[in-house]
Curated annotation (Swiss-Prot):
InterPro entries to which the protein is assigned, alphabetical: Ribosomal_bL28/bL31-like_sf, Ribosomal_bL31, Ribosomal_bL31_B, Ribosomal_bL31_sf
Gene name of the record: rpmE2
Name of the protein in its database record: Large ribosomal subunit protein bL31B
Lineage: Bacteria, Bacillati, Actinomycetota, Actinomycetes, Mycobacteriales
Species whose genome carries this gene: Corynebacterium glutamicum (strain ATCC 13032 / DSM 20300 / JCM 1318 / BCRC 11384 / CCUG 27702 / LMG 3730 / NBRC 12168 / NCIMB 10025 / NRRL B-2784 / 534)
Quaternary structure note: Part of the 50S ribosomal subunit.
Key words of the record: Ribonucleoprotein, Ribosomal protein
Length: 88
């Protein structure tokens, strides 16, 4: 490998902002904030909005959108507007 062209790939702790869940992984991301991990070492801390701990797909709290009902509701509210034409 060539020197000085690759990003610094190091251990980082990611924390879910909503749940507080933390996990240690490797990344090129860096941060000024640090956290002491279970092994006693200090690692950079990256706070993220969504992780597998809080995302609806992974938590099972996923909702299915009723698109047919939404289209019918739209048609009821605005369907007649397209049919009406003003005569000049």
């Amino acid at each position: 490998m060539k020197k000085d062209i690759h990003p610094d790939y190091h251990a980082v702790v990611f924390q879910d902002a909503g749940t507080g869940f933390q996990f240690l992984t490797k990344s090129t991301a860096s941060s000024d904030r640090t956290v002491s991990w279970e092994d006693g070492n200090e690692y950079p801390l990256i706070v993220v909005d969504v992780t597998s701990e809080s995302h609806p797909f992974w938590t099972g709290a996923q909702r299915v959108m009723d698109t047919a009902g939404r289209v019918e509701k739209f048609e009821r509210r605005f369907g007649g507007m397209a049919r009406r034409k003003k005569k000049a």
